[in-house]
Amino acid sequence: MKPKAVLIGPPGAGKSTIGRRLAQALELELVDTDAEIERTTGRTIPEIFTHDGEPRFREIEESVVRDALQATDGIVSLGGGAILSDRTRELLQGHTVIYLEISVAEGLRRTGANNHRPLLAGGDPKVKYQELMRRRRPLYRRSATIRIRTDGRSPARVVGQLVSKLQDK
């Protein structure tokens, strides 16, 4: 099996919302890897980060991503930091990977002071988000086969564009 598409992007880009709506529009299953991690471990992502650390979280995430890519022909939505793993980027090769692009300002507006996002907790949220994007943006761009901006666009409009692009594939 091979997913119809894999969604990547930073926190606040709309991966969960767009993923859910895109799956509905295409009448496909959605696999949200963050939700799968929580389901399979019985813990929240912040709990895993706090008790086991980011390296262990990324190992769990790699395994969940691998399983999701093998087990569904639907839509797979990855956590924002999944792209940091060399192994995960290797797993994405040969798949339709959609990068949901967003500006730092819009990403900050959408995520706010969300303390459920471990890598944005503590310190100046703007500085943290800018650093996160500086590090991840090149990885998102290299991994993507389709790029679409979500700033100032309704989820319905983004999904409509993606449905058109995916039907052309």
Swiss-Prot record:
Pfam families in UniProt: SKI
Organism of this sequence: Rhodococcus erythropolis (strain PR4 / NBRC 100887)
Gene: aroK
EC number: 2.7.1.71
Binding residue positions for Mg(2+): 16
Function: Catalyzes the specific phosphorylation of the 3-hydroxyl group of shikimic acid using ATP as a cosubstrate.
Record-listed ATP binding positions: 12-17, 117
Compartments where found: Cytoplasm
Name listed for the protein in its UniProt record: Shikimate kinase
InterPro entries (alphabetical): P-loop_NTPase (IPR027417), Shikimate/glucono_kinase (IPR031322), Shikimate_kinase/TSH1 (IPR000623), Shikimate_kinase_CS (IPR023000)
Chief localisation class: cytoplasm
Thylakoid as UniProt keyword: no
Pathway: Metabolic intermediate biosynthesis; chorismate biosynthesis; chorismate from D-erythrose 4-phosphate and phosphoenolpyruvate: step 5/7
